[in-house]
Amino acid sequence: MSFTLAHFSDVHLGPVGLSDVFNDFRLKRIVGGLSWRFRRRGLHINSHADGLRADILAQVPDHICFTGDLVNIASKAEFRRGLEWLKSFGEPPAVTMVPGNHDAYVKAAHETGLGLFNAFMQGDGSASDHAFPFVRLRRNVAIIGLNSAVPQSLRKAGGTLGPQQRVALEMRLKDLGA
């Protein structure tokens, strides 16, 4: 039985407008907004992301996984735009998301930030807001979502899996017979 999984990441949807930077003020957002404006704007082009989406949907995959960096500076406006874009791939049972470091660029309110994506970031039968790692079973495939995205200081961008997630992952893998 075949299973087609479409996987992609790092679309960094733009543009990053001044209102994204100043209406949701953090010093790191100013630095990131300027970086986007003067360096990254030519790298992260929405028409490329839209072309990727069209190509993925034309392949009619069994499931779609997006693994981070939907946005640039984690502003409320970016998250709202990103949610609409991600929804255009399909309903949450058919689309899985885990955040990347730019999705956790700064500490942000869950309900107006990553919380908007809860339905895409939870396991089968789970309604928890913070359910990493989560497991989604799709036919003969287990999709396991981990979250290494943590807000970092001004000049840093990275991530880590804490001991709690690693222990939970080990338990989930045992439950799956792996």
Feature locations, PLM:
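Short beta-strand segments at enzyme active-site cores
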Residues: 63-67, 97-98, 178
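N-terminal active-site segment of His-dependent metallophosphoesterases
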Residues: 1-79
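Extended active-site neighborhood of metal-dependent phosphoesterases/phosphodiesterases
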Residues: 80-176
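Proteins with a high burden of low-complexity, intrinsically disordered sequence enriched in S/T/G/P/A and R
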Residues: 35, 177-178
